[in-house]
UniProtKB/Swiss-Prot annotation:
Keywords: Amidation, Antibiotic, Antimicrobial, Chitin-binding, Disulfide bond, Fungicide, Pyrrolidone carboxylic acid, Signal
One function term, GO molecular function aspect: chitin binding
Residues found modified as Serine amide: 74
Organism: Penaeus setiferus (Atlantic white shrimp)
Protein name according to UniProt: Penaeidin-3k
Family note: Belongs to the penaeidin family.
Length: 75
């Protein structure tokens, strides 16, 4: 009797390891790693128009190109 139980357990374990066993829905939430948005160099235009505040700050920090209201880039 113990041999039968052991064989059934091993067979079911082998099926699960091969992906042939229970194929239910994934029950845990999928966690996405936090990735900082990367601003491309193309976003740092010379006119400061059409870019977001975040992109403007990034351009100022990384490249020294800082937007000022109605003045365009300085630096």
């Amino acid at each position: 009797m113990r041999l039968v139980v052991c064989l059934v357990f091993l067979a079911s374990f082998a099926l699960v390891c091969q992906g042939q066993g229970y194929k239910g829905p994934y029950t845990r939430p999928i966690l996405r790693p936090y990735v900082r948005p990367v601003v491309s160099y193309n976003a740092c235009t010379l006119s400061c128009r059409g870019i977001t505040t975040t992109q403007a700050r990034s351009c100022c920090t990384r490249l020294g190109r800082c937007c000022h209201v109605a003045k365009g880039y300085s630096g």
